[in-house]
A protein has these predicted regions:
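Short beta-strand-loop/turn "lid" adjacent to the catalytic site in phosphate-handling enzymes
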Residues: 85-91, 107-143, 180-181
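Glycine-rich phosphate-binding loops at beta-strand->alpha-helix junctions
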Residues: 121-127, 275-278, 282-304, 319
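Conserved phosphate-binding catalytic cores of ATP/NTP-utilizing and phosphoryl-transfer enzymes
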Residues: 129-163, 168-178, 324-330
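Conserved phosphate-binding/catalytic loops in two-lobed NTP-binding clefts
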Residues: 137-144, 302-325
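Glycine-rich phosphate-binding loop plus the immediately following alpha-helix
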Residues: 178-230
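Adenine-nucleotide phosphate-binding core of ATP-dependent small-molecule kinases
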Residues: 234-284, 319
Length: 337
């Protein structure tokens, strides 16, 4: 009989739930199931007990790979759409990041090239890749379709404004069934945050900025409504920002500056989500991308929710939404060879 072992994925450690359809459990299964051949010789005919050549069992894995401006995200999907595991790799150039992510993923999960049914590329860096990767069938999905499909699948929504907060920020309208429409984009995003913090505090790595900003005091950086009036409008909370970096103290610490930069970027994105919702006549926004892991995301978008009545959703594994969507689009035959 086949024995099955569970190998915990690289980025996440949690109890492994029962294998379910991707659309039912919204990617809560974050481990990979590998079929191993028996340790003893395989006997096809138990009566003769003649040892035959061991049978090797291969999985059929679809790899969705999102090649972004600074990081590459890779997700393995079973043919039923359920997630195997996820991995994120940073590299100086996108092609190196792609091949590094693929090799790392296969090794970490005990897979071989024969286990891969198809590679599906998306993201800005996909344009630099031509032909098949390592001889594997390779196709491409446009980033907007992948982002919209992944966001809806992860959140369980039928329609929503989808915001991908990557190096820049993209705004889309997505509907269940494959309709994804690009609304607009903004140059303000993770790249903005990295550039500002490199100049302000000498850091540009996302993990470093995230840790530093969590210790900062916005009162040392931003001007609030309470700072400029004692009689604000009834609908406005006095603690809301009136001007980003409008009250910069001379003794502001690096942590304060980092917090101010994070606040500026998130509030700019939040303002654009309000306009996008008005354009699409909706009050549901799904936030995806690496920046969703910032501690300041929740309080910032809670303020927008109170002000404008918009429901913001940050689904589990939002960082990998586009890579997951690429794989799902491939299963729906929306990929381009």
């Amino acid at each position: 009989m086949l024995c099955k072992c569970l190998v915990t994925c690289l980025d996440y450690k949690r109890p492994v739930p029962e294998k379910q359809s991707f659309f039912k459990n919204h990617v809560k299964n974050l481990s990979i199931l590998i079929d191993n051949t028996p340790s003893l010789p395989y006997y096809e005919n138990q009566r003769t007990a003649m040892p035959l050549k061991r049978k090797v069992f291969h999985m059929e894995v679809i790899l969705g790979i999102d090649i972004g401006g600074s990081t590459t995200k890779i997700v393995g999907l079973r043919t039923d759409g359920s997630v195997l595991s996820m991995l994120r790799v940073r590299a100086e150039d996108q092609v190196t990041s792609l091949y590094g992510a693929l090799g790392n993923y296969l090794t970490s999960n005990g897979l071989t090239l024969k286990d891969v049914r198809r590679v599906v590329l998306t993201g800005v860096g996909a344009s630099y890749v031509e032909g098949d990767i390592y001889g594997l069938p390779t196709c491409k999905v446009d980033e907007f379709s992948a982002s919209g499909t992944g966001a809806l699948a992860l959140s369980g929504q039928d329609s929503a404004v989808v915001v991908t907060m990557g190096t820049g920020t993209a705004f889309m309208w997505a509907e269940k069934g494959g309709t994804v429409r690009h609304l607009c984009g903004s140059g303000i995003g993770g790249g903005t945050l990295g550039g500002l913090c490199r100049k302000l505090v000498g850091m540009e790595r996302f993990g470093q900025i995230k840790k530093l900003a969590a210790q900062g005091d916005l009162g040392q950086v931003d001007l609030t409504i309470a700072d400029i009036t004692c009689n604000p409008a009834p609908t406005l909370d006095p603690t809301l920002t009136a001007a980003n970096f409008g009250n910069l103290a001379e003794d502001a610490s690096p942590a304060d500056l980092a917090a101010g930069a994070v606040n500026l970027v998130l509030q700019a994105i939040g303002t654009m989500t309000v306009l996008a919702c008005q354009c699409c006549d909706t009050r549901t926004v799904i936030l995806t991308g690496s920046m969703t892991t910032l501690d300041q995301v929740k309080p910032n978008f809670e303020n927008f929710e109170k002000l404008y009545g918009i429901h913001y959703i940050v689904p589990e594994n939002a960082t990998f939404a586009t890579a997951i969507g690429a794989g799902l689009c491939s299963l729906k035959k929306n990929a381009v060879d």
